[in-house]
Amino acid sequence: MSDRHLSPLLSALTALLLPCLTATAQTGIAIDHDFGDWNPAGDLATADTVGPLVAAGFATDAENLYFHLVYDRLVALDESWEPHGTRLGVDIDGNTSTGQIVGGFQGADIVVHLQDRYVSESNTNGTTEQHSLNDRYVRMAPTYGGEEHEVSLGRAVNGVPVAGTVRWTVRCGSGQQVSGEVALDNTPALAMATPLERAEGAEVRVAFWNMNRRLDEAPALEAMGRILQAVQPDVIGMSEVEDFSAAHVRDLLDGWLPLEGGSWHVAKDDWDLMVCSRWPITTEYPDIYRQFPVLVDAPWAGDLMVAASHLKCCNGAEQRRTEADEYMAFLRDAMTEGGDVDLPSKTPVVYGGDLNMVGPGWAMQTLLTGNIHDEVANGPDFAPDWDGTALRELTCLQSDRAMDYTWRNDNSSWGAGKLDYILVQDGVVKVLREFSLETSSMTAERRTQYGLEPGDDLQASDHYIVVADLKKRDRRPGTKPVQLKKAN
């Protein structure tokens, strides 16, 4: 598991020990809930300890302005269950007599109201216009609650000049504020061009995808087919497929990804989940609410358990935590002798899907660590990896953009966010490649290479497919992974 879940205030403490008068410019930043690309020494600490804001940093590259935000409590930037009232202000013309006032900062031409989910921009005539976060390419991570966050703001769409300096500020509703000034950096944004082919040595490629109930819409089906032909998964966990039969999905997959001498294996639970596999599905466990584990006869020594998930949406943090508790009780039973399910030792388990992880993120902590909330109903805590550690949350950065969001609706007030996840037991599998796919951010050459169209991502669904290549760590000596024939 990433250290970001273990020490969220490390950079804040460093910032408090190393105060400076202005932020140090830096580049090479990904919006991915991994803060290792931020220099804590460049953060500015707030002058008081009232909270919630502890420190903030700022950086630029040729595409974006970036903010690094550190709090003393769990905060979700675009939600108000923990009120924070964070505003980000940027002065792009260097004129303090124009623009908006943000606390003690004058001249903000752009003000991002994170909690209220809009951007206010000043016009030359003294008026302001309101835009959505999506209109102004505001991206942030994590999507759920955390003590540390990062935000990007598109330069071109917001009229940020190509040269000069910008003044910036971060202010919380309770009055904490830090401000600075930096020279604009035109270093290219972090380059991404992840190969869509499976990684060398990969034995299983797993994917998870919310199909948005579009499996009977011709334009969506065409886009889905192109994406799946480009990605070539072995096992797919699907959600929002309640209106379709397993036979319908099997026929689609047989057309998109034909198997030599056979058909796809498709298992459906009692609600909206399916697991589809090139190899036989030997056992199904459909009784776990909004989660569907199955056993797959994988090409390595022993089985593979894949659990497709679609946790409660929106304001359902308590229910998501209950659902996570129920699944982890199942996994604990499966990994220990006795009870209803007994997996052979070191059987890899992969969990993923649309987790709807917004709000405090309690469910994610349960899923990663095995820290069960309601132990009376679901039993004791346990270590969910066979090596006695926590699970690993895969970043699944987009193949062609250094962003981790997997859901996007440009007409929504909610900003793009990461809702789709893959969690693995990295004590028993190696992750050789991982990505999500936003076709609109690919170059024309890359799309041509893989037979994709610019709008395939949102034509297929409002969620992006997430993909991981896995290799079992303890495959028997002398055995070789099955080589799959690529479909035309």
Model-derived segments and spans:
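Structured beta-strand-rich core segments of catalytic domains in phosphoester-bond hydrolases
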Residues: V241-G316
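Extracytoplasmic/secreted cell-surface and envelope-processing proteins
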Residues: A76-E79, T98, D216-P219, F244-V249, ...
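Metal-dependent phosphoester-hydrolase catalytic domains
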Residues: Q26, V151, V157-V160, S174-A189, ...
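Bacterial N-terminal signal peptides
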Residues: S11-C20
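Surface-exposed, glycine/proline- and aromatic-rich loop segments on solvent-exposed faces
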Residues: T27-Y118
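Acidic/polar low-complexity flexible segments
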Residues: Q26-D32, H84-Q115, Y144-E147, R155-A202, ...
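N-terminal, active-site-proximal structural segment of metallo-dependent hydrolase catalytic domains
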Residues: V178-W256, K268-L273, D303-L304, Q319-D325, ...
